[in-house]
Regions:
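Structural register within alpha-helical repeat arrays
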Residues: 12-13, 44, 51
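Residue at a conserved register position within TPR or TPR-like alpha-solenoid repeats
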Residues: 16-17, 48, 55, 102
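TPR-repeat structural position
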Residues: 22-23, 61-62, 68
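Alpha-helical solenoid repeat scaffolds, predominantly canonical TPR units
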Residues: 29, 48, 67-74
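Alpha-helical linker/edge segments of TPR/alpha-solenoid repeat scaffolds
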Residues: 53-58, 92-112
Length: 189
């Protein structure tokens, strides 16, 4: 029997985290739960781990470090199996990622370009059988986001403005090349 006490948004977070590695969606669903639960610090720490991994994977090493470091400080005193997961293991892995990012950021941008830190996904180990069952059941009902949002994305209006700007530049370039061709023809002997 599935434990009904597990928040569906928390279960969805675990699906996106472990199955899809979709840290953007992890943030979206867990932020909703975090706000609903009066900004519970443990949920905030889990949210920050997802955001930190999102930044790390997308090359924002400073942002990744800041989020992961904050998450570690927020979660390091939580019970080792809080919320039905191996919290101690997750905190240790997040701490290792934060340490790696801190070293990379301290070395400077030149070194980052030559040898960026190696990214790896984390997996949240589910230790409570009822939670594991709830997550397995949710696998078929939580849709996979394809394509995943792996980088910063702007809305449709931005895309339309960008296309209009590019078209304007092409028109000006074409008009400029016509003018220069006309000038060259007039100057020809």
């Amino acid at each position: 029997m599935v434990n009904p006490s597990y928040e569906p948004l928390y279960v969805t977070y675990l699906v996106y985290f472990n199955r899809d590695r979709d840290y953007f969606e992890c943030h979206e669903v867990l932020e909703e739960l975090w706000l609903k639960l009066d900004r519970d610090p443990v949920y905030k720490g889990l949210l920050q781990i997802a955001v930190g991994l999102y930044h790390f994977r997308n090359g924002n090493y400073r942002g990744g470090y800041m989020m992961l470091d904050s998450a570690v400080h927020r979660l390091e005193h939580a019970a080792s199996h809080a919320l039905g997961i191996n919290m101690a293991k997750l905190v240790d892995e997040a701490r290792a990622c934060a340490r790696q990012l801190a070293e990379a950021v301290m070395e400077g941008s030149g070194e980052l370009q030559r040898q960026p830190p190696v990214y790896r996904d984390l997996t949240i180990e589910i230790v409570e059988p009822g939670l594991r069952q709830a997550v397995e059941k949710a696998l078929s009902s939580v849709p996979v986001n394809i394509p995943q949002q792996r980088g910063p994305r702007r809305g449709e209006k931005h895309e339309q403005r960008q296309q209009a700007l590019e078209a304007s530049i092409r028109r000006r370039q074409a008009a400029g090349s016509l003018r220069s061709a006309t000038v060259e023809t007039k100057d020809a002997p």
